[in-house]
Amino acid sequence: MSILIRGGTVVTADQSLRADVYCSDGVIKAVGPDLAVPSGAGVVEAGGQYVMPGGIDPHTHMELPFMGTVASEDFFSGTAAALAGGTTMIIDFVIPNPKQPLLEAYDAWRGWAEKACADYSFHVAVTWWSEQVHKDMGVLTKERGVNSFKHFMAYKNAIMADDEVLVNSFTRARELGAICTVHAENGELVFHLQQQLIKAGITGPEGHPLSRPPEVEGEAANRAIRIAEVINVPVYIVHNSCRESLQAITRARSEGQRVYGEVLAGHLLIDDGVYLNPDWDTAAAHVMSPPFRPKGHQEALWQGLQSGNLQTTATDHCCFCAPQKAMGRNDFTKIPNGTGGVEDRMSVLWHHGVGTGRLTPNEFVRVTSTNAAQIFNIYPRKGSVSVGADADLVVWDPKASRTISAKTHHQKVDYNIFEGMTVTGLASHTISQGKLVWTDGKLNVQRGAGRYISRPTFPSVYGALNRQAELKRPRSVQREAVR
């Protein structure tokens, strides 16, 4: 199948230019003005619209077994919803149970993901430590195309990685040339605060943000960053929700450390007032970790995105329907943590980013696609509009509008955290692997069409880190022997 996208403005992370884009056999074959229509090619008229790299959501959880239930969104429905919003690839997470071999968990997630209709990859979580984990990390990087390992500093008595696990895993990642990703919340403090709140009779969703204040996130982010500094490994802090974690990242980056930061679309726009909603179901629907914060944090996060100290935008798409959330009706600590957004991320960020002047269209491409592709080493195959790149593209209508609602979205969940928000700037066409999968409000997807994307490790980054380490290597002091 071949497609010519004609008459649009190509927008990449670096430039904007009037050009046509020709795609064939799943890749981009030509980019330039006034391309001739090859025989048999379909034509997408993109006049007045932007042609951009498809979005990459680097943080999703499809079909996640968590907190006594399983996320309602599966890999087919979730990737279909992503395509409807202009996102053409997700990076999900393999999360082994404590004592479960990493390879066993990886194989399970690969099996679940076979139904995906868009391309995907996996971070793998390190939830415990042993020689088996050490060995499995090596197999995953060398034979399975994994270059990133996740560490949960929260969820005590479940999947929390303590400092010993962090040190061992970060050290092994450095040996392998991988990057470490971190959910930064002090799990011991969260557990302590949860118990105090329950004893005080605060059992509803309003207790959730009280048990996870910004200081808990800031401390953990700083600790993970400093451990990474000592071990000399790159680190990526996921879902930054507050100025405290942003400050830790900004400080480390100003000191030359290789630290990256992610922000969720929801954390840029929603405040903690949602937990005070008198309707329990509405309040519980917003329970996720880290929680939504007081309004002042949102502007700080936007500034982090504008300054480049936060490089990527994600969703942490992890859906639980109302009956699942109701598992914690009498105890907020039992409400399954997670919200949706994989379908809405691009339009929400365009409306509130480009539409307000916070971001240029090029910066939008950078934070929704290209930076993630570069950080996780799949660029320029993904995240670019260039000859030889995968034909994963979105044709973006900057004037089209819609009102977001659970009644009309494609996500498999019965609420939407952006409910009632009217956004301007939508995907008119989404192209995945060179095929039109979203056209003017209609999906045309194939179950199982998604491919697993291998991600190699980072020899150039580690080459630089190794040179720095050699220059700083401690050397013993040569002294005369005592006579």
Where are the regions a protein language model picked out?
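Short catalytic-loop micro-motif centered on adjacent basic/acidic residues
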Residues: 91-92, 121-124, 234-239
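Divalent metal-coordination and catalytic microenvironments
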Residues: 8, 26, 48, 59, ...
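Metal-associated gating/positioning segment near the N- to mid-region
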Residues: 46-115, 132
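Histidine-rich, glycine-flanked metal-binding segment
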Residues: 1-53
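Histidine/acidic residue-rich metal-binding segments in metalloenzymes
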Residues: 135-313, 318-321
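His/Asp/Glu-enriched, well-ordered alpha-helical/loop segment
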Residues: 203-234, 282-286, 306-313, 319-399
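A glycine-rich helix N-cap at a beta->alpha junction
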Residues: 111-126
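C-terminal cap of metal-dependent C-N hydrolases
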Residues: 327-331, 387-453
